[in-house]
Regions:
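Pocket-edge structural micro-motifs
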Residues: 10, 73-75, 152, 180-182, ...
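Short, solvent-exposed cationic patches
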Residues: 42, 130-158, 228-237
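Cysteine/selenocysteine-centered motifs that mediate thiol-based redox chemistry or coordinate metal-sulfur cofactors
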Residues: 140-197
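Short, solvent-exposed amphipathic alpha-helical segments in soluble enzyme
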Residues: 26, 87-89, 125, 164-166, ...
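Active-site bordering "gate/hinge" segments
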Residues: 1-103, 109-111, 204-209, 213-237
Length: 237
């Protein structure tokens, strides 16, 4: 990943492509994988690399991940709730309506890390797109892509329920997930795991996703990504 000047997120099934300028120095990369050193801590199951446009705990609503293009929200949602008061029934309602993305994707047009518009690919997909629009009408910050995560655990099975451990799910060769909302500043942090999306280098090499071999996103090059091994999940507080 570090040898490439940018990454492409491609879904050939729905003809979407987005460019991610992943080497910006104002990002922070978090790792929940690899050997656990003395005094360290990881979630179980481990196996996630994620990037945010800010350092852990330093919230700034103007910061952005440089993502531009069209992305397919096609896969399994996770709806995490933060510290503000909420009802479990409301959290479950959001999860259930977004769960149609398992079979009926929504296409998002993204400009500089912000979702400009949504396109339902079917009548069924409108359930998810309308739910998302309702969230944005209450808090427009849900349009910001706060996190891009890469699940690297190809040995685990996904839990078909609203469960945070699914973030580590790596399908066959790694799986991307898009993170919307950032607790505790928004009520919810929503992840959409999209195994169908390919992550490609600037030369077209498939780094993760699909049916190719999973490549280590941490390979070295002259330019390094700012990363740290996180004690907690940076996107949930």
């Amino acid at each position: 990943g570090e040898k490439s000047q940018f990454l492409l997120m491609v879904d050939n099934t729905f003809g979407t492509e987005a460019k991610f300028e992943h080497l910006a120095e104002d990002y922070e990369w978090f790792e929940q994988l690899g050997p656990l050193e003395y005094g360290g801590q990881q979630f179980a199951p481990s196996g996630e690399v994620s990037v945010l446009p800010l350092f852990h705990g330093n919230y700034d609503s103007e910061r952005r991940l440089r993502v531009n293009g069209r992305i397919s929200l096609y896969g399994l949602p996770i709806v995490n709730s933060g510290k503000p008061s909420f009802l479990r029934s409301d959290q479950n309602k959001i999860f259930q309506r977004l769960s149609v993305l398992n079979s009926h994707p929504v296409i998002a047009t993204v400009t500089n890390g912000v979702i400009d518009s949504l396109e339902a690919t079917s009548a069924e997909a409108r359930t998810a797109s309308e739910m998302f629009e309702r969230l944005c009408s209450v808090d427009s910050r849900y349009r910001i892509i706060w996190e891009i995560g890469f699940g690297a655990n190809t040995e685990m099975e996904v839990i078909k329920a609203n469960r945070s451990p699914n973030e580590s799910y790596g399908h066959r060769n790694g799986a991307i997930h898009w993170g919307l909302g950032l607790t505790p500043w928004t009520q919810y942090h929503i992840d959409i795991i999209c195994p169908n999306t390919l992550i490609q280098s600037d030369g077209g090499e498939v780094l993760a996703g699909g049916h190719t071999n999973y490549h280590d996103l941490r390979r070295g090059s002259d330019k390094k990504m700012h990363r740290q091994a996180a004690i907690g999940c940076p996107c949930i507080a």
